[in-house]
Amino acid sequence: MAEKSINIASWPCLSNGLHYNWLVDYAAFSAFGTFELSAEEWEKRDLIVNFKGNSELTTEIDHQQAVDKAIDLVSSFLKAVFSEKEGAKNSHSTLSQLTLVCLPASTQKHTERRFRKFSEEVCAATGMQNAYNAFSFTTTKDENGDEVDTLHLDETFFQGKQVILFDDIIASGGSIVRFAEKLEKSGAKVIAAFALGKKIPDGYDNNE
């Protein structure tokens, strides 16, 4: 993993001005115009695919190993960014004052599979508050009889919270922007966002 800046002010911004970062580059099938990747690039891609865990090629062992690796990577990164030494630079004193919010997936099943253990262990390692239980789902059926999960959030939980948003992958960044706006309407202050991976090429950074 390439070294990432721990100074949030130096991170690129999404369309709403929110600073964000990521840990590994994710090569999409269109990356580089071909799909001839190095061993390291395949390893990074596999980490994201296996973490998401919704590929038929992902075994349960692959998924759990990817979750465990992500827990270590993310915990270490958060400790570096929000350590007491860097607190003044980033305007936050300790991780214990921050709340980790993992962006829910489209279904309850995928949300639990990706983020339940992940958020519990990252927060245990860093001392952050875990927002996982502030989200719930109701399930209905559409006109075709297919189940549809609807996300609900406990707005009172987020009042006054300083939030770090996390997603498994950033593509356009739109989902993070929309979710940040929703949290801020509930009274939270979104400090920054980061992801396990970022799809390349992108073309949506402010400086690109």
Stretches with model-predicted labels:
Residues M1-L95, F135-Q162, S172, K198-P201:
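Active-site-facing substrate-recognition patch
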Residues H92-S106:
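Short glycine-rich phosphate-binding loop at a beta-alpha junction
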Residues T99-L100, Q162-I164:
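Structural motif
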Residues F118-D142:
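Histidine/lysine/aspartate-rich catalytic loop segments that bind and position anionic ligands
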Residues E121, R178, K182:
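Active-site signature of alpha/beta-hydrolase-fold catalytic machinery across serine-
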Residues Y132-T140, S186-D205:
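ATP-dependent adenylation/pyrophosphate-handling site
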Residues D168:
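Active-site-proximal glycine-rich helix-loop-beta segment
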Residues G173, V177:
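Glycine-rich SAM-binding Motif I of class I
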